Amino acid sequence: MNPSTETNPVAADAFSAENDFLSSVITSSDTDSRLNPIPERYRFLSGSMLKLIACITMLIDHIGAYLVAHNGPVLFKLRGTAYTWYTIYRAIGRIAFPLFCFLMVEGFLHTRNRFRFGRNRLLFAIISEITWNLIHSNKLFMPGSQSVFVTLFLGYLGMCAIYYLRDNIPRMSLALIALMGISYLIRCDYGMKGFCLLVALYLLHRARIFQFAAGCGYLNSLTKSGIGFFAFLFYNGKRGFIRGRWKYAFYAFYPAHLLVLWMIKYKVFG
């Protein structure tokens, strides 16, 4: 207990109430409908639809980053059009990362086994690292940067720190600072900003409007990533059509599409 509260019952009650409130916010998987400006009847996006949108926009983003950026003159014959297409592809692709973070938070909140949830994300992070290295350097090992799945896994560890250390704020804070430092040092995709975004979405999961505001504030790019954050408001809380083992196809899509793009980039265009 805080030493200052031992001789002050009023302060002790306030400290206890603050801890109880924080604990209820962290442990509850429910969303307060009053904190979503979109009426429930208009919330038409299921988790499966959000996954589909995330995958499609990510694919568009990576086509722009890895094919158009390096092979513009081949893909687009007219001079000057490659940069225009590159900009369009990357702008559309900015929608994907906020959705991946949001889905990660929703998965953490509703999973029945948080250890297995994290283990699966770690496994896909390791697999994805191979294709990430190939697409960036045409080598199996490239320590200079890490894939977005590493960022998401660090976000998972951050959510675990908040959930399991919620009664020990100093230890929780140290754990989060350490994870922020790791995300910066190993140069994860989206870096420390991406890690902080995921943690913020978790802390604000009961209020969709606050998630939207925090997301736009973090990425400071309403015209690009803002569309992804708007999708939060239309989420209906339902799983949708992707069920059972098919959910792993969503995660396998990331390394699989990078592998295909690597083959096109290096084997077709050279």
Report each predicted region and the residues it spans.
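Alpha-helical transmembrane segments and their immediate juxtamembrane cytosolic regions
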Residues: 1-270
